[in-house]
């Protein structure tokens, strides 16, 4: 019974580690495709707020939330 509990705990830990690592990769890839990363200077608090910020800042195509790196957090990236 003790070995079964240990085996289940190990299995669940592996599943958790794999799911978290995949999430981080998706967050990096999804954020900045097609956008110029030079204009990611403001924290992103939502898609609509980012779009409005970029339009007011002079980027007529708007913007999108993106992350340049995992510890950087999400920034509002404006499109030229």
Curated annotation (Swiss-Prot):
It is found in: Secreted. Keywords: Antimicrobial, Disulfide bond, Fungicide, Plant defense, Secreted, Signal. Belongs to the DEFL family. It comes from the Eukaryota. Residues 1-27 form the signal peptide. It comes from Arabidopsis thaliana (Mouse-ear cress). One of its GO terms (biological process) is defense response to fungus. GO terms for cellular component: extracellular region. This is Defensin-like protein 46. Disulfide bonds join 40-78, 44-65, 50-76, 54-77.
